[in-house]
UniProtKB/Swiss-Prot annotation:
Listed CDD domains: S14_ClpP_2
Active site: S119 (nucleophile), H144
Organism name: Bordetella petrii (strain ATCC BAA-461 / DSM 12804 / CCUG 43448)
Main location group: cytoplasm
Domain of life of the source: Bacteria
Gene this protein is translated from: clpP
Catalytic activity: Hydrolysis of proteins to small peptides in the presence of ATP and magnesium. alpha-casein is the usual test substrate. In the absence of ATP, only oligopeptides shorter than five residues are hydrolyzed (such as succinyl-Leu-Tyr-|-NHMec, and Leu-Tyr-Leu-|-Tyr-Trp, in which cleavage of the -Tyr-|-Leu- and -Tyr-|-Trp bonds also occurs)
Full protein name: ATP-dependent Clp protease proteolytic subunit
SUPFAM superfamilies: ClpP/crotonase (SSF52096)
Oligomer status and interactors: Fourteen ClpP subunits assemble into 2 heptameric rings which stack back to back to give a disk-like structure with a central cavity, resembling the structure of eukaryotic proteasomes.
Localization in the cell: Cytoplasm
Function: Cleaves peptides in various proteins in a process that requires ATP hydrolysis. Has a chymotrypsin-like activity. Plays a major role in the degradation of misfolded proteins.
GO molecular function annotations of the record: ATP-dependent peptidase activity; ATPase binding; serine-type endopeptidase activity
Amino acid sequence: MQRFTDFYASMHGGASVTPTGLGYIPMVIEQSGRGERAYDIYSRLLRERLIFLVGPVNDNTANLIVAQLLFLESENPDKDISLYINSPGGSVYAGMAIYDTMQFVKPDVSTLCTGLAASMGAFLLAAGKKGKRFTLPNSRIMIHQPSGGAQGQASDIQIQAREILDLRERLNRILAENTGQPVERIAVDTERDNFMSAEDAVSYGLVDKVLASRSEG
């Protein structure tokens, strides 16, 4: 019997593609002429070109998602990739690495919110290919301005303040392009946490359609 865990682990230097911090991960066992193959559920779904952004956006998350995007592009540059998002957000820098790679790869990247897409999670949700950005009916989407804590000498705080203001301007400009909203409205609407229902997110331009069933996609 031949048994494998993490079918695509080798492309990460032996590391799993499974999102971290999820506790018990179901395994899928497939029978073949060579015996049994066991995959964690996320590695199995990667074969179907499904990538999951689950939990906070951080360097580890970004590295895994970027690697999976590039791998799926190399597998088939003409077939769509689906990115499922259930994330409270996190690092702007890590999120921008994912965003840039989504735009860089040749396949269209379709996005789907399952639960919550907040902060950088919402930013990445809106970054999917226009016409292919979806949300489930009871999901929540939240946008706001970037936040950060500054400490140190006055000159250090000034440098960090300039950086976060530059990031806010950049994020607002990209969000305006992806939603069709004026950048002035984006600036106002992201001043504080701005929660939206699935229908509100469609009206705002963050997503294109609410999906109640797979047949509607």
